[in-house]
Amino acid sequence: QDLKDNSASTALNYEHKFAVSEMFTPVLNTGVYGEFKKRNFDARRFVYNMLGSGYDRFAEWDYSSVFSDANISTDRIYMKESTNKSDSYTSDNLLGAAYVAAKLNWGERLNANVGVRMEYYQLKLDGYESDGIKPVHLDQNATDFFPSVNIAYNLNEKHQVRLAYGRSVNRAEFREIVPYVYYDFALDANITGNVNLKNAYANNMDLRYEFYPTPGETVTIGGFYKRFDNPIEQTYMEAGSGLQYTYHNADHANAFGVELDIKKNLDFIGLKGLSFVFNGAYIHSRVYFAEGSFERDRAMQGQSPYLINTGLFYQNDNAGISASALYNRIGKRIETVGVPKQNPNDDIPDILSLIHISE
């Protein structure tokens, strides 16, 4: 494989502080950003082939020596190039953005960050379908606006409530779009892109309560809701023998849940230098499809119903000693979306990634 990526970017930011009064000191931020990426990709494919008496005598060979020098010849096993036009592509990616944001405060208790970002995005792709015959010429562009609001209210020095909203975009990566087929050793499957992928958009809302009992200690509990339009998911692709995966857009999806964060020093029980950290979340997600579709509502691909991260940390600066013990647990999730049929008994089921634990 020969992969060449060239990129260039530039940015300009400006900030202005206003002194309206002692209780109101807003800050205005604005700026622009530009980025250009160009990719050239070429790959060559080789396969082992067998001719002549090789087929007749293959069953007699010792499998441990199939590829020995004695068996590599034009009438036994030899390498043959199978490269076609779909193994090469070129792509250009242009992003231009401008933003304006304001930091607002009303006294010492209420603070707000509000802003909007405008982005122009263009993607060009030239290549071939996996058959190496049909050319692919892609030219996508979109102009989007992404507003955001973050409001924090300080109940007192130790307690704070935060409310946030933001809109974001998930643009398909090169590997998710280009029709190039590559083999994933971890999945034991071929993976190819989908030139018809659309950008995925998300509207995110969070409500959090934050408690700071002492410096360096936090307790945060919050709820969140996310709405996804055109979420990108990895799916099974019917392609004859062997496994092959690709990517597609679902119609829309929702996710909501609760999250708890704790950071607590254990000095109060005589364990100086030892701290406890916990992060846990429960997430309920659901993907929805158009009425009449063979697809059935399910959890989002790649989304676990719960996450647990916890650990103990020891720090002794005088002795130069630090140590930690960590525990992570992730609930089972859909690794790859299957293929639904008109008759549910003929479905190709989803592939699940079961519970993952690391210590």
What are these regions (language model features)?
Residues 1, 41-47, 124-132, 174-180, ...:
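Outer-membrane beta-barrel translocator domains and adjoining extracellular loop/strand segments
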